[in-house]
Amino acid sequence: MPHKWVPKVYDKSSSAQKIWAEEVISKIKIKGDERVLDIGCGDGKITAHIASLLPQGSVLGIDSSAEMVRFAQSRFPFSSWPNLSFRYADARDLHLSEEFDLIVSFAALHWVLDHRPVLVGIKRSLKPGGRLFAQFGGRGNAGEFFNIVEKLIQDEAWAPYFWDFAFPYGFFSAEEYREWLGQAGLKAERVELIEKDMVQPDRQSLASWMESTWLPYLERLPKELRSRFICQTVEGYISAHPPDGDGRIHVRMIRLEVVAEKP
């Protein structure tokens, strides 16, 4: 069952994702005439940034959330962004034959548990010599925060809502990802886990981040209990990992960064 994303909430609480995506984009040697695919485009702001770098090219953003696609289309209309388009699509079922010079994906693919069909579709969609640049949650991502959540869902007050809960994210190691790239016919150029420091200015910002992205957990709960669950998680995390001297809260994130080429 697809998650019910709230684009405006995500837009306000995804500054870290935007910064990390722009860091990766800055490493790509974009000529300006490429045809680009952005997998998991979300609210569209990163896709629009890419479009601004393509005066003679174009970019297609796809997402499996119809809410996100509608939001992106309304925020970045074709009348103002003629080289930018958005489409509802599932990353596990790509049928875009050799259309793209470049495929990117940021803070999205960890929502997919089996990446093998995704990589097969990416290979199919790239032109020969085309490249993939992706960054998403990797093995150990937000581990300290997950520890708090996992303890909480075992509490007697919350356990009945999670009795059959399975870990919903695909956080993988570099080794297994290199193997999958090879199986899909893609040549790995760089695959590595990198550490990032996600900084939230205060408790409310941390709570908003959880509200916008921890949907597999929150959607298990009645709506009237979600704020309480978020509050208990945030307070538990801050108790174990106090804010710094400026009151900012830090969450250690692990991202898997992937660069590959279609031979």
Q: What does each of the following model-derived ranges do?
A:
Residues L37-I39, D43-D93:
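Class I SAM-dependent methyltransferase SAM/SAH-binding core
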Residues R116, R131-P201:
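Conserved catalytic/acceptor-binding region of the Class I
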Residues M1-E34, K45-H49, M68-F71:
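Conserved class I S-adenosyl-L-methionine
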Residues A188-G245:
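C-terminal helical/coil "lid" or tail adjacent to the Rossmann-like core of SAM-dependent
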Residues V112-L113, L126-P128:
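Helix-to-beta-strand junctions that scaffold the AdoMet/dcAdoMet cofactor pocket
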Residues S208, R255-P263:
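Core SAM-dependent methyltransferase catalytic element
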Residues R92-I103:
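A short acidic, Gly/Pro-enriched loop at the edge of an enzyme's catalytic core
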Residues L102-H115:
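A short SAM/SAH-binding and catalytic strip from SAM-dependent methyltransferases
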